[in-house]
Amino acid sequence: MASSARPPLTAAAWAPLLREALAREGRFRWPLRGTSMLPTLPVECEIEVAPLPVPLPERPRERLHLGSLVVFAAGDILVAHRLVRRAGGQWVMQGDGRRAPDLPVEPEQVLGVVTAAYQGGRRCWPDRVEPAVRWFWVARYYLLRPIRFTWHALRGLRGPS
């Protein structure tokens, strides 16, 4: 008996659909799962995603800023994490509730920027302190970077256990 279940959509299949929806509608809402953005975003909230800002010749500084929450494709899932670094044409993101950053991604993997979060129909993010909080998370990335580097170097010197 043949199964009638459809195979799940892959990122290659749904990312263009989401980009098209963003271009057509200007925004979309997406349910957020997981704890990687705690304490900033509550578990099982709904995020509002808008297109990335496009720098124009007359406004060259209008671009995505460090500390912005972005949505990107990682494998076959959507991830909402904070942009903490741009390096060598790639972007590095990190969840506020994570100790280490994500692997670098190509800018083409980034689908949009999070503009708001809702829980129970009420807006829960951003709040008045978000501009200061944004810089706290970016600073944390840079302050912990030498510690992570040293930790990995020392672990490499120990050899296999």
Language-model-detected regions and their locations in the chain:
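Extended hydrophobic leader/signal-anchor segments used for secretion and membrane insertion
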Residues: 1-161
